[in-house]
């Protein structure tokens, strides 16, 4: 899963990296020690060993690892960069939990720290992928392994150093939002989930900024700009049922409508129970054929929801 901010910044300028973000956050509460063994799950030491084996196979090194209260960083990025990245993750995680608890969700961190593979630069990222990353790729959250992969963008794009803080923060926040969504009780990696739901949550969070009150859930102007630039509309019923809208031709609009959907459902307290019920029902299904039934049951008639979202879009486009 990768972030794309339409209109104002291309995915190339948004990209990679992350670790340089926000020295003003400080190093945060970093700790050492191992987690207790959880049946069926790797211990922290085992996780470090697995990641280091993967990185050494890509001929990366020297390797370091850094811990914060809820995150574990492993990679060839310097420890100072790892600490800065984890400080961002911790600050976002705290705001994330507060925000979603305030909207009726039961959310908690998992027992074990979340893994962040923190790489030195784009070359290290390419080595890990065993392929040159596309110009639109800027780190990613790996749904299968449940790991966030980031790298330091500054060394590759000296020409935009002045933008580095914004670029790095956006990328890190979007991808960490995915990791938090799938690990705090909102989403489940093991079920069939429409892409628009996971991307809608990530875009709902992606403009978070440290030290800004109520920074999660604000109006996402770049996504609105993508709606403005679009010449078409993807019916919400189609977006919830068919993930092909996230192919390159229509992905900008798909991201924008995903943000609009989640923002609309969470903005008003009267709609929040519908969204919580929808997510709870989705947790119990792993069949794509169930998508329409679950959405209609919990969110109401999809044609009506589509009409409401078009009205919502028009309101923002007039603003």
Question: What are these model-predicted stretches?
Answer:
Residues 1-10, 20-23:
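N-terminal secretory signal peptides
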Residues 20, 25-29, 183, 208, ...:
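Short hydrophobic alpha-helical membrane-anchoring segments
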Residues 28-54:
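C-terminal segment of N-terminal export signals and the immediately downstream linker at the start
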Residues 60-189, 194, 285-297:
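Juxtacatalytic substrate-recognition/specificity segment
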Residues 140-148, 167, 188-319:
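Acidic/His/Gly-enriched intrinsically disordered linker/tail segments
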């Amino acid at each position: 899963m990768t972030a794309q901010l339409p209109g104002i910044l291309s995915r190339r300028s948004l990209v990679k990296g992350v670790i340089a973000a926000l020295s003003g956050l400080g190093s945060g509460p970093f700790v050492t020690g191992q987690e207790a063994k959880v049946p069926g799950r790797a211990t922290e030491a085992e996780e470090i060993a697995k990641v280091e084996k993967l990185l050494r196979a890509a001929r990366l090194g020297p390797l370091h690892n850094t811990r914060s209260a809820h995150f574990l960083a492993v990679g060839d990025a310097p420890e100072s960069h790892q600490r800065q990245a984890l400080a961002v993750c911790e600050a976002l995680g705290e705001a994330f939990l507060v925000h979603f608890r305030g909207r009726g969700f039961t959310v908690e961190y998992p027992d074990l720290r979340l893994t962040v593979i923190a790489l030195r630069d784009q070359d290290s990222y390419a080595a890990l992928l065993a392929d040159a990353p596309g110009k639109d790729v800027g780190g990613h959250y790996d749904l299968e392994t449940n790991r966030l992969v980031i790298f330091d963008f500054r060394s590759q794009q000296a020409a935009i150093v002045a933008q580095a803080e914004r670029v790095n923060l956006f990328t890190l926040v979007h991808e960490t939002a995915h990791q938090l969504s799938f690990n705090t009780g909102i989403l489940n990696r093991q079920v069939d989930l429409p892409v628009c739901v996971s991307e809608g949550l990530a875009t709902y969070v992606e403009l978070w900024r440290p030290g800004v009150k109520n920074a999660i859930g604000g109006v996402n102007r770049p996504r609105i700009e993508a709606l403005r630039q679009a010449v078409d509309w993807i019916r919400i019923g189609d977006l919830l049922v068919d993930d092909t809208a996230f192919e390159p031709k229509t992905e900008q609009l798909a991201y924008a409508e995903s943000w609009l959907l989640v923002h609309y459902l969470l903005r008003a307290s009267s709609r929040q129970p519908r969204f919580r019920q929808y997510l709870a029902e989705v947790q119990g299904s792993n069949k794509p054929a169930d998508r329409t039934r679950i959405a209609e049951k919990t969110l109401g008639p999809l044609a009506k929801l589509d009409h409401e979202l078009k009205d919502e879009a028009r309101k923002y486009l007039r603003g």
